Amino acid sequence: MISTKKIDQFENHIGYSFKNKKLIISALIHPSFLVDKKKTKFKLPNDFERLEFLGDRVLGLAISSIIYKKFDNNNEGDLSKKLSYLVQKNFLHKISINLKINNILKYSSKKNEKM
């Protein structure tokens, strides 16, 4: 599904090597890809949604910590607005293109059209 070469290229680009390759593969293959490609014989555990859930929380916490420290004169409302902007779908999509995640992520072509 995702070649070792592509994972290696991605790791080199972001400067991080994933210890658990199965986990990164699970995180990069959206279930819609399997349905779209009619690869129903290929079963992935439901890790994608679980990893998405966890990743959303980790990302929110990490960004909250950064803006809390950086904008020490801002009130809670201003910090919340900054956080909301930084974790919104459109902003994260731009980041994913910059990180070249789109070169390795597998998802339905129908899902791609919505982005």
Where are these regions (language model features)?
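RNase III-family endoribonuclease catalytic core
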Residues: 2-115
